[in-house]
From Swiss-Prot:
The protein's name in its UniProt record: 4-hydroxy-tetrahydrodipicolinate synthase
Recorded superkingdom: Bacteria
Any single GO CC term annotated in Swiss-Prot or TrEMBL for this entry: cytosol
Gene field: dapA
EC number: 4.3.3.7
Length: 297
């Protein structure tokens, strides 16, 4: 679904010092991300600490961000769960709130079969009018959604795309070759964005775009317009920063980076912990080589 945008940021969830959600800061961050190149935002995905944000907090975040953003950009609600019924109910609530689409992660922990994955996503998609984006991230879910399952699901009209974070480029090529023409493939890994664009993917659902969104957007637009040399140069330039943002589990590094740069997003909820000094020093050193696109003040 091309109108959701080529550059979508998987947004962190800001917390106050007491650990509660900072809805006002989430709104400020959302607007800053749109100002720095993002076409849309994923709210309460992996980067938004979805496992430790309650359903009530999720719904309030969907509403707060959508209220702030309005028609300036797309709001994609992270409504997935490893219970089909819970994911369905969460998606229907997000639809009532008025978000633009939903992101549905492969069910984690319970290790469904490929048929189970197909029925899980089919059940949710057929119950909502929202555009649904599949999210394949086997490094977190253990279960890998096969290309055949994605291709099969792409025949359901409101399953409009997939965030592919498996890193399996051969599988991704198979998907791109066999889905319907308007089915959209986004990279789910910042480091895979340019390679996947070269294979026919549309864009990226990004973490690094919190701080270098304009540069990632330029890389994408350069590639699309045929200036592949510039796109490749930007990709190479951003690689060390991207590496530092994933040196430990996301969103630990990006939250540290934002706080260090002066955009307060608070801490993390257990069992996630804040960056230790070794990690923090690595991130600080990496940031020295980059222009920061996010408006900080």
């Amino acid at each position: 679904m091309k109108e959701l945008g080529r550059l979508i940021t998987a947004m962190v969830t800001p917390f106050k010092k007491d650990g509660t959600v900072d809805y006002a800061q989430a709104q400020k961050l959302a607007l800053g991300l749109l100002d720095s190149g993002s076409d849309g935002l994923v709210v309460v995905g992996t980067t938004g600490e979805s496992p430790t944000v309650t359903w009530e907090e999720e719904h309030a975040l969907f509403a707060a961000v959508k209220s702030a953003v309005g028609n300036r950009g797309k709001v994609i609600a992270g409504t997935g769960a490893n219970s089909t019924q819970e994911a369905l109910e969460n998606t229907l609530k997000a639809e009532k709130i008025g978000v633009d689409a939903c992101l549905l992660v492969v069910p984690y922990y319970n290790k469904p079969t490929q048929e189970g994955l197909y029925l899980h996503f089919k059940t949710i998609a057929e119950a909502t009018k929202l555009p649904c984006i599949l999210y394949n991230v086997p490094s977190r879910t253990i279960t890998h959604m096969s290309p055949e399952t994605v291709i099969r699901l792409s025949q359901i009209p409101n399953i409009v795309g997939v965030k592919e974070a498996s890193g399996k480029l051969d599988d991704i090529a198979q998907i791109i070759n066999n889905v319907r023409p308007d089915f959209t493939v986004w990279s789910g890994n910042d480091s895979d964005t340019l390679p996947m664009l070269a294979m026919g993917a549309y864009g990226v659902i990004s973490v690094a775009s919190h701080i270098v969104g304009k540069q990632i957007k330029e890389m994408i637009t350069s590639f699309v317009s045929g200036n592949t040399d510039n796109a490749a140069a930007i990709h190479r330039h951003l690689t060390p920063l991207i590496r530092s943002l994933f040196v430990v589990s996301n969103p630990i590094p990006i939250k540290y980076a934002l706080n260090y740069l002066g955009f307060e997003v608070g801490g993390l909820r257990l069992p996630m912990t804040e960056a230790d000094e070794k990690t923090a020093a690595l991130i600080r050193e990496s940031l020295k080589g980059y222009t920061i696109d996010l408006p900080i003040k």
